[in-house]
Amino acid sequence: MKDAITSLIATYDVTGKYFDDNAVDTLNAYFSTASARIESVKIINANVSTIIKTAASALFDEQPELIAPGGNANTTRRYAACLRDIDYYLRYATYAIISADVDVLDERVLDGLKETYNSLGVSIAPTVRAIELLKNTSKELIKAAGISAVDFIDEPFDYMGKVLADSSL
């Protein structure tokens, strides 16, 4: 798992270059948002149950066929698996928020997920929507706590949603 700094160093190391102005700007951006990223993750961690419950409730309200007979979250086992997966996306999003790098999402979440879901007959579209709901709920809580610059929250959630949506074509 990499973070923004180790990724930057690796890029410059491979090319044998010293940091240029772009590298310094990247480092400044990383450090200037560090406190807000840490505080945001603290808020998410303190509200995991609420975030998951809110996102799942909204998803099932929007798509009741998921919990209807024959739906992918109909049985207790499938419903629990759905909630487990939603929790998984949220947890790894927090890792990406702290590291300011989405590599962990590829390594630990996205690689092979489409194939797994397809083999189980699970639609990708509700997963993408659940990730969007996690993002929205998290941002609301973070903004309510007084952290106004929260654009960095979007990156991991949007990245997961885009990769999954693109992979389902």
Swiss-Prot record:
Keyword field contains Membrane: yes
Binding-site residues, (2R,3E)-phycocyanobilin: 82
Modified residues (N4-methylasparagine): 72
Keywords associated with the record: Antenna complex, Bile pigment, Chromophore, Cyanelle, Electron transport, Membrane, Methylation, Photosynthesis, Phycobilisome, Plastid, Thylakoid, Transport
Tree of life domain: Eukaryota
Gene Ontology process terms (BP): photosynthesis
Subcellular locations according to the entry: Plastid, Cyanelle thylakoid membrane
Protein purpose: Light-harvesting photosynthetic bile pigment-protein from the phycobiliprotein complex. Allophycocyanin has a maximum absorption at approximately 650 nanometers.
Family per similarity comment: Belongs to the phycobiliprotein family.
Protein name per Swiss-Prot or TrEMBL: Allophycocyanin subunit beta-18
Native organism: Cyanophora paradoxa
Gene coding for it: apcF
